[in-house]
């Protein structure tokens, strides 16, 4: 099967950003999908919008999935995804909830869904190394991600990769190889 996009699912600090950067080094066709974000916190890597703009998109049926976390609302919008597809790009979408993966699968594309996983200890270490000020909250989200996976009746991911065992460049090569298969 040929895939149109990549979903990277996993707990905080499981390597989604690092693996995305490595994929983009492998091919200029890959493009990190910047989610819409309304609220406080980090702005890099997001398309910042107001709550009113988000409500308008929601009302018009243009939000594929959204979640409230870390004092903000994050959303995947069909306009942003379609723009990347129209440009011939391969979107890489980061997800932290199984429901988001399922909603994205319903969008008009074939997705390579990848579970990136690392231990809770590694999540804590990585979060501290990158200077996260909300490490306790991120560890709680790690627990929530594990619980979220426990709700699945059967495995849902095409690939599952331990990022505390394999380095980011190796992980990217594995994903890129799967994308290249027809």
Where are the predicted features?
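Walker A/P-loop
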Residues: 16-17
């Amino acid at each position: 099967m040929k895939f149109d996009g990549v979903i990277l699912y996993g707990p905080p600090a499981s390597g989604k950003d690092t693996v995305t950067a490595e994929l983009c080094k492998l091919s200029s066709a890959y493009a990190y999908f910047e989610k819409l974000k309304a609220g406080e916190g980090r702005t890099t890597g997001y398309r910042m919008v107001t709550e009113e703009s988000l409500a308008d998109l929601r009302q018009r049926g243009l939000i594929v999935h959204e979640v409230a976390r870390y004092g903000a609302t994050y959303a995947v919008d069909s306009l942003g995804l379609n723009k990347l597809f129209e440009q011939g790009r391969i979107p890489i979408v980061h997800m932290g909830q199984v429901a988001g993966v399922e909603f994205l699968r319903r969008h008009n594309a074939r997705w390579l869904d990848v579970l990136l996983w690392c231990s809770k200890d590694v999540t804590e270490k990585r979060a501290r190394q990158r200077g996260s000020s909300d490490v306790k909250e991120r560890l709680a989200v790690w627990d929530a991600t594990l619980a979220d996976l426990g709700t699945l009746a059967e495995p849902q991911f095409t690939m599952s990769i331990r990022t505390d065992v394999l380095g980011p460049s190796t992980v990217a090569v594995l994903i890129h190889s799967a994308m290249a298969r027809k």
